[in-house]
UniProtKB/Swiss-Prot annotation:
Molecular functions per Gene Ontology: 1-(5-phosphoribosyl)-5-[(5-phosphoribosylamino)methylideneamino]imidazole-4-carboxamide isomerase activity
Cellular compartment(s): Cytoplasm
Enzyme class at the top of the EC tree: isomerase
Pathway per the UniProt entry: Amino-acid biosynthesis; L-histidine biosynthesis; L-histidine from 5-phospho-alpha-D-ribose 1-diphosphate: step 4/9
Species this chain originates from: Nitrosococcus oceani (strain ATCC 19707 / BCRC 17464 / JCM 30415 / NCIMB 11848 / C-107)
Homology family: Belongs to the HisA/HisF family.
GO cellular component, one term: cytoplasm
This protein's name: 1-(5-phosphoribosyl)-5-[(5-phosphoribosylamino)methylideneamino] imidazole-4-carboxamide isomerase
Tagged with keyword Cytoplasm: yes
Gene Ontology BP, a term: L-tryptophan biosynthetic process
Record Pfam families: His_biosynth (PF00977)
Catalyzed reaction equations: 1-(5-phospho-beta-D-ribosyl)-5-[(5-phospho-beta-D-ribosylamino)methylideneamino]imidazole-4-carboxamide = 5-[(5-phospho-1-deoxy-D-ribulos-1-ylimino)methylamino]-1-(5-phospho-beta-D-ribosyl)imidazole-4-carboxamide
Gene that this sequence comes from: hisA
Iron-sulfur is among the record's keywords: no
Keyword annotations: Amino-acid biosynthesis, Cytoplasm, Histidine biosynthesis, Isomerase
Length: 249
């Protein structure tokens, strides 16, 4: 079970939002590179970087910071989302040392882009599905689409994405607990790993997610709980390793 610290970037700073609202942010650090180094030292094997400004702008805004993090941690698996709308952006990130590009809004607006990206960058494409009450949200969560979560996941699984990152918007940044039931339901419906995101708030939830690993839950992204020290990463990694019975790498 992968446990993946989140670094959300807004205005060049490391922030956390509540339910994806850009106006409801908390700044945790003015130095995202130092934050990334901290999580690496604590044992993280993968980092989840989100260009929040880019998600709304439709193109990278905080790319320079992401490049600096990738350069500082050449052995770290880094996944990046936010503002990825064309293959040139994916290529630039991969050339900079990023391991995975997360396609979200573009997948809904132009489904063929996912298939094309999987062919052009095999093994490097993740699908980010952000949902509220089972419906997919796009454009930095500012717009709710008519698309059903599981239907969309099954469609894009066939295109060759490596994994799906599922975020329950209503739980994100609220410290109310990850939606294990919905995450497990999604994981059972497809044959690629699902990475849980949104609301992970305690070690108990980490344990519960690990118990659903056989359903296809391959990891969890942790944000506010780490920054507010509700969860200590090293302790969480030890629990995940013990319950998974194998390395969390």
């Amino acid at each position: 079970m992968l446990l993946i610290p989140a670094i959300d970037l807004k205005g060049g700073k490391c922030v956390r939002l509540r339910q994806g609202r850009m106006e409801d942010d908390t700044v945790f650090s003015d130095d995202p590179v130092a934050v990334a180094l901290h999580w690496a030292e604590a044992g993280a094997k993968r980092l989840h970087l989100v260009d929040l400004d880019g998600a709304f702008a439709g193109q990278p805004v905080n790319a320079d910071i992401i490049y600096h993090i990738a350069q500082a941690l050449p052995d770290m698996d880094i996944q990046v989302g936010g503002g990825i709308r064309d293959s040139d952006t994916i290529q630039t990130y991969l050339d900079a040392g990023v391991r995975y590009a997360i396609i979200g809004t573009k997948a809904i607006n132009a489904p063929h882009f996912v298939a094309d990206a999987c062919l052009e960058f095999p093994g490097h494409i993740l699908l980010g599905l952000d949902a509220r009450e089972g419906k997919i949200a796009i454009n930095g969560w500012s717009k709710l689409s008519r698309h059903n979560l599981i239907d969309i996941a099954q469609r894009f699984e066939k295109d060759g994405v490596e994994a799906i990152i599922y975020t329950d918007i209503q739980r994100d940044g609220m410290m109310k607990g990850v939606n294990i039931e919905a995450t497990s339901e999604l994981a059972k419906a497809i044959n690629i790993p699902v990475i849980a995101s949104g609301g992970v708030s305690s070690l108990t939830e980490i344990e519960a997610l690990c118990q659903h690993e056989q359903d296809g839950i391959g990891g969890a992204i942790i944000g506010r709980a780490l920054y507010e020290e509700k969860i200590q990463l090293a302790e969480a990694l030890a629990i995940a390793k013990r319950l998974s019975g194998e390395s969390t790498a």
